[in-house]
Regions:
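Structured core elements
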Residues: 19, 47-49, 101-104, 215-217, ...
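Amphipathic alpha-helical transducer elements in NTP-driven molecular machines
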Residues: 29-32, 66-70, 297, 354, ...
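Short, hydrophobic/aliphatic alpha-helical segments
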Residues: 25, 349-363
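Polybasic/polar functional segments that serve as interface/processing modules
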Residues: 1-46, 50-102, 109-111
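Intrinsically disordered, low-complexity regulatory tails
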Residues: 83-163, 315-318, 364, 368-371, ...
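Active-site helix-to-loop segments that bind/position phosphate- or nucleotide-bearing substrates
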Residues: 127-316, 324-325, 329, 335-351, ...
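Conserved NTP-handling cores and scaffolds of large molecular machines
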Residues: 13, 39-46, 76-83, 109, ...
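Well-ordered beta-strand positions
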Residues: 39-40, 93-94, 217, 323, ...
Length: 393
């Protein structure tokens, strides 16, 4: 950071990536809460030597910068203060004859979260707006789930009997599509053998145990409700634009799905085709069926299937929501991006929260291949004359 960048920060004030502390004589205890918050969220800059004066900020400087820096970093790196190492880069600046200390804090990798203080996981902080806030228990549980080497969707599910675990219609739908897309597999293979072959059943002695992925993709209503006590998807068709205030009648139609992913997709597709215009284009030369999907269907399908694949199903306090406004579509998903959100637009494989669910959808070509979907959605949507899609993590 140079002096001009620092002046811009002082003018803009505190926000989610910068925190000012007066810290003239000693390290404030709240500085470590900021370290936890930045490391658990998206990183940021912690600046010593700047005091808040009403709605503005005054450069006060640090009286003994060498001692202040050493005291702060030695406590930070002590085993008892934070539970995980945090990458901190220090910088010193002389502004208006006063010394300012700047600490650039990097976000920790998901395997090294949550970052908490004094050995107490309840002292986990998150950065929200211009403040540091104690994480709620559901936030802590989410970070712990994401930190484990075992993915949630690969864990065994044993809450119902195997013969009650699956929805036969969903398995048939999937197998029909699988054999259309993939040649060389035996269409007469028994269902259990197929599911075991692709890792959706685990063997325990002589019995099979389904995984969480198997239940989310193929599960019976009983099994799905035992696994996630909240809807899979909430779809709202709204009669106003995203910028308009909410009217007394909130929606034209609404669909709440509490079934598996395949059933959720089929129900969503029926609603989508009912509400969206369907101009006839031509005849499919293979199936001889009408090709009249709405414009932008490929983009919608990718966004919707991504919503079903990548949500944090272990979070029982929130649900995925699709809102059809008059001027756009909003997809809201529980859970932040599992990997590095700065690489979302790059080609190639990415870390995903639910790899078994993702592969199930890719095997039947219900979504784009790994590393291509985000760019496809952006390019195809703009080709149709729409603004570039807006993404927020």
């Amino acid at each position: 950071m140079n002096i001009e960048e620092l002046r811009k920060l002082l003018k803009a004030g505190e926000w989610n990536d910068v925190e000012f502390k007066e810290a003239r004589m000693e390290v404030p205890k709240s500085a470590f809460e900021t370290i936890s918050a930045f490391a658990n969220t998206h990183g940021g800059r912690l600046v010593f030597g700047v005091a808040e004066r009403g709605e503005s900020y005054e450069i006060t400087g640090v009286d003994h910068p060498d001692k202040m820096q050493n005291d702060f970093l030695s406590v930070l790196h002590a085993d008892a203060k934070v539970n995980h190492d945090v990458q901190v880069t220090e910088q010193r600046m002389n502004l208006e004859g006063k010394i300012i200390l700047i600490f650039q804090v990097a976000e920790n990798h998901r395997m090294r979260k949550p970052v908490y203080l004094d050995g107490d996981i309840r002292r986990t902080f998150l950065r929200k707006g211009s403040g540091d806030y104690k994480a709620q228990m559901q936030d802590i549980e989410r970070m712990l789930r994401d930190a484990t080497a075992d993915r949630w969707d690969s864990l065994p599910f044993e809450k119902v009997l195997l013969e009650e675990a699956f929805h036969p219609g969903s398995i048939r739908w999937y197998l029909d599509r699988f054999h259309q897309v993939n040649s060389g597999f035996d269409p007469k293979q028994p269902d259990q053998e197929f599911l075991y072959h692709w890792g959706y059943l685990l063997r325990d002695g002589r019995q099979y145990i389904p995984t969480n992925a198997a239940i989310m993709v193929f599960g019976s209503p009983l099994a799905v409700h035992q696994l996630i006590p909240r809807p899979t998807l909430d779809v709202q068709f709204l009669g106003y634009t995203a910028d308009e205030p909410m009217p007394e009648t909130r929606w034209i139609d609404r669909m709440i799905c509490e079934d598996n992913i395949i059933q959720a997709w089929e129900q969503l597709l029926t609603k989508y085709r009912f509400f969206m215009p369907k101009p006839f284009r031509d005849i499919d030369p293979v199936t001889l069926g009408r090709r009249d999907d709405p414009p932008g269907f490929r983009v919608f399908r990718e966004a919707a299937v991504n919503l079903l694949i990548h949500q944090d199903y272990g979070d029982h306090s929130r649900k995925a929501v699709i809102k059809f406004f008059r001027d756009g579509i909003q997809f809201w998903n529980p859970g932040d991006v599992f990997g590095d959100d700065s690489r979302l637009w790059e080609p190639g494989e990415k870390e995903v929260r639910n790899p078994s669910i993702a592969m199930a959808m890719r095997r039947i070509a219900l979504c784009e291949q790994a590393g291509t979907g985000m760019r496809m959605m952006r390019e195809e949507w703009q080709k149709l004359g729409h603004p570039e899609p807006f993404f927020r993590n």
